């Protein structure tokens, strides 16, 4: 049976409450930090950490570039850095704003930890809609289970996209081998997308500080194995996700393998985003499985 405990950590003078779900039989633990974007900030197997943390970014006010950020109401950076609703342009952060907000603890129990984020006057300055987000985290052996429910609390249809940006520990990029099946693979989501090669790889060009692969028609699960540290990570997702992103930057010891629901400008493009009618809700589910090989 899982155990759920709380702990407090201090980063650069800031104190954060964390919820830790532990499966003693599987020797796994999942750490969630509600105040830091309501996200996963740790996932260990037999004491070995699989989620990468960038310090001092943990305690900074800017966008988290570590852990498992929740992306809402968009993924990536929209054209011009704005969303256009009813003829008006609204500024939008890269990957939306959910990862910048402190989330409230909705419930803690046998079904895991559920956090809530509700619209405020500040979020409506960026995104003129009333909403509630509920994210649930649970642990099943060596698998973290994550669900996101989006609720339209307003009086008009609500457009959005969503996704996640997990940072996984990696010994070195050249040690990481991917097992992914998808329809297309490119470095830019604009225009016609080239067919994916039989083998998906992530390599950095000479002189580049980062590397990216944008995938469509992903046949989940996506998996990578790191021959340097013996980690195997599997990301599985339901039918609400059909896109994936692989990313790595600055030769840091991480690799991102991300499930996305939309592209950077999807919310501005007709037919390329989700729309919830008044009082409607939508739930998506995905998981992270960690293994030692």
Task: Give the predicted meaning of each segment.
Residues 1-13, 84-140:
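Extended, loop-rich substrate-binding clefts of extracytoplasmic carbohydrate-active enzymes
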Residues 231-293:
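Active-site pocket scaffolds in enzymes
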Residues 1-69, 73-82, 89-92, 218-241, ...:
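Beta-strand-rich N-terminal accessory domains
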Residues 106-113, 138-143, 170-173, 248-252, ...:
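A short, structured loop/turn motif at beta-sheet edges
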Residues 157-159, 166-238:
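Active-site/ligand-binding surface loops and adjacent short beta/alpha elements
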Residues 21-23, 34, 119-160, 164-166:
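Acidic, contiguous internal or C-terminal segments within carbohydrate-active enzymes
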Residues 134-136, 211, 271-276:
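Beta-strand-rich interaction surfaces with strong enrichment in secreted/lumenal proteins
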